[in-house]
């Protein structure tokens, strides 16, 4: 691809340290992969393993598809049958993978910022492996964030001045935290809605909380979030949760769908709870980008993986 500044990174664990021009370059690279069908040409083998300590369908399969399209050799890893169950630390597991010849790890883990121990090494530590964060607890989800940015850019062609509403279980959503960070930096106006008990004043620096029906007619993007029941341990509001009531107050139904602007898009990181965040028969509607997001995820993850290959000079890429 001509006239493109290709990104090179030693790891890809968060969007916080990405420069705006790197974000835009990754979007362009992913769009190039999608339109051209081209892939990076590796001149030497690269070995990757996907270490998912939390359940995943989309992200796990999407990363593996991206890896295979790039020509990487994927080495299976099953946490349920690993030595982690014998008490082995994530660092030691990574050290084992590294010693066996693994070049890259794609990791999803319930611990926030689990990657700090793997990338900020002490003087005596010898771990030398690229880490791609596929989601850390309620912290960050950089690949979902980047595919969201790609999907928005693909539809609108820009970010500046777009009005984006992030709706739902915001406090427990790693997607929301990554997306609000990048959207505001790229010039979008961010708004929040959903149950106030799942909203934190910490988010006020990124946008404004409003009632959903006030936002509906004004927004360009409606970004819906799954209710994260698995992260509500000890939360008294979980016991009071009622799916029908949530859908009535915070979900996108036909009435709200019809009240949106003509060009408004609906996004959701998945999995969608039908008739909770979104009416089930709207999942494949014209405005809903759910399927498009999944399609774009493969190409964006190719761009992210390629950036780490370049950063680590793997596969003959520099």
From Swiss-Prot:
Catalytic EC class: transferase
UniProt entry keywords in alphabetical sequence: Pyrimidine biosynthesis, Transferase
Enzyme Commission number(s) from the entry: 2.1.3.2
Keyword Transferase: yes
Listed GO CC annotations: cytosol
InterPro entries documented for this protein: Asp/Orn_carbamoyltranf_P-bd, Asp/Orn_carbamoylTrfase, Asp/Orn_carbamoylTrfase_sf, Asp_carbamoyltransf, Asp_carbamoyltransf_Asp/Orn-bd
Catalytic activity entry: carbamoyl phosphate + L-aspartate = N-carbamoyl-L-aspartate + phosphate + H(+)
Database matches in SUPFAM superfamilies: Aspartate/ornithine carbamoyltransferase (SSF53671)
Residues where carbamoyl phosphate binds: 58-59, 108, 141, 144, 270-271
Binding site for L-aspartate: 86, 174, 226
GO molecular function, one term: aspartate carbamoyltransferase activity
Pathway in which the depicted protein is active: Pyrimidine metabolism; UMP biosynthesis via de novo pathway; (S)-dihydroorotate from bicarbonate: step 2/3
Keyword Transferase: yes
One Pfam family, short name: OTCace
Subunit structure as annotated in this protein's UniProt entry: Heterododecamer (2C3:3R2) of six catalytic PyrB chains organized as two trimers (C3), and six regulatory PyrI chains organized as three dimers (R2).
Role, per record: Catalyzes the condensation of carbamoyl phosphate and aspartate to form carbamoyl aspartate and inorganic phosphate, the committed step in the de novo pyrimidine nucleotide biosynthesis pathway.
Family, as annotated: Belongs to the aspartate/ornithine carbamoyltransferase superfamily. ATCase family.
Name of the protein this chain belongs to: Aspartate carbamoyltransferase catalytic subunit
Organism of provenance: Lactobacillus helveticus (strain DPC 4571)
